[in-house]
Amino acid sequence: MLEGHDRLQYLVDKAREVEPLPDTAKTEDNRIRGCASKLWIIGGADTENKMQYQVDGDAFITKGTAKVVTDIVNGADKSEVARLTVEDFTPLGIKELLTLQRQNGLGELITRIIRIANA
């Protein structure tokens, strides 16, 4: 398990893996509220009912955190994602590295992921 600085570096590295969303996807409807920086998410189920999400943001830690979370749920069955809760992501240990405002944003991101799966 990574500790402190190594976890932050991991989040920055994950942020660098993010494929930018087109500007047309960076709408207020796709924006995650409650975060210190801007973060957008789009997603839905593919033809096999597997969830696929894409994120983008304007801050490395936020974008990296979102990438870690979406990597976990991408490819999962829609019904599995729909049953998740915010608490299911606690073992990741990311929350402890984030400011309170970023923790709120993480909760909003996970809530949106679940809402998209329930749509």
Predicted regions and their residues:
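N-terminal intrinsically disordered, cationic/polar leader segments
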Residues: 1-38, 45-50, 87-119
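Residue-level signal for well-ordered alpha-helical scaffold segments within enzymatic catalytic domains
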Residues: 10, 68-71
